Amino acid sequence: MQNIFLAATLLGAAFAAPQNPPTSCSAAPQPTGTGSPGTVCGSTTFTNYTVKAGDTLGAIAKQYNSGVCDIAKVNGIDNPDYIKPDQVLSIPANCVTPDNTSCVKPVPVITNTCVLGVGSTYTVKSGDSFSAIATSFNITLASLEARNPQIPNYDLIFPGQVINTPLCPNSVCDSIGTYVIESGDIFYNLAQSNNVTVGQLESLNVNVNVTDIHPGDIIILPHNCHNITASA
């Protein structure tokens, strides 16, 4: 009988003892961004990716089965054509409905045949083509080819080669000075805000890698290049 009472006492004590609440596992931190898994393109997860030299959003999107515009949206990228090495991106991976079009602006028809103010030569870089160079100066391909009759094959150019760009007569820049790169600067935005082209910036900064600039770097920066009216 004593054993029965002892067992009952122990059993009651077991039920009466306070139970420790279950320990919850903290969720893994999510990469920073403006969306969350499931709200962007139907993605169920975000992945951090550090941009390398030569990367494009298109290639990164393809690698992670994402969308160019989805990545741009999450990371606050205004121009999907311009990302910088060492930039950390939050990638919505395995998109159900990837968006590759909504953020892409229509390509403007280029009709200019000369460059305003400055930039009469350009030094070819690895990966360049005549077409890409013409676009960077916002001039037609035909006008760039016409300025370089010394080149026998426009499809065969090499790094370090200097080509001519057609400079507009009676055109000037309001100023040409130095500029110290600040955090967040990219060449495309600097060109737009100073009313010049990326090609002009590249032509004046031959030894600068335009996709890999850092705060404190010093570049040559023209401002507001334009046509002038000849004096009467």
Curated annotation (Swiss-Prot):
Gene disruption: observed consequences: Severely compromises virulence toward wheat leaves. Produces no to only a few pycnidia.
Cellular component aspect of the GO annotation: host apoplast; host intracellular region
Signal peptide range in chain numbering: 1-16
Disulfide bond keyword on record: no
PROSITE patterns on file: LYSM (PS51782)
Record's note on what induces expression: Expression is up-regulated during wheat leaf infection.
Top-level taxonomic group: Eukaryota
Residue positions with a glycan: 48, 100, 138, 195, 209, 227
Domain LysM: from-to ranges: 47-91, 120-165, 177-221
InterPro entries: LysM_dom, LysM_dom_sf
SUPFAM superfamilies: LysM domain (SSF54106)
GO biological process, one term: effector-mediated suppression of host pattern-triggered immunity
Record keywords: Glycoprotein, Repeat, Signal, Virulence
One Gene Ontology molecular-function label: chitin binding
Pfam families the record matches: LysM (PF01476)
Further comment found in the protein's record: In plants, chitin acts as a microbe-associated molecular pattern (MAMP) that is recognized by lysin motif (LysM)-containing plant cell surface-localized pattern recognition receptors (PRRs) that activate a plethora of downstream immune responses.
Record text about domains: The LysM (lysin motif) domains are small globular domains involved in binding chitin in eukaryotes. Mg3LysM contains 3 LysM domains.
Function text: Secreted effector that enables the plant pathogenic fungus to manipulate host defenses for successful infection. Binds chitin fragments and blocks the activation of chitin-induced plant defense responses. Protects fungal hyphae against hydrolytic plant enzymes.
Family: Belongs to the secreted LysM effector family.
Name of the protein this chain belongs to: Secreted LysM effector Mg3LysM
Species of provenance: Zymoseptoria tritici (strain CBS 115943 / IPO323)
Taxonomic lineage of the native organism: Eukaryota, Fungi, Dikarya, Ascomycota, Pezizomycotina
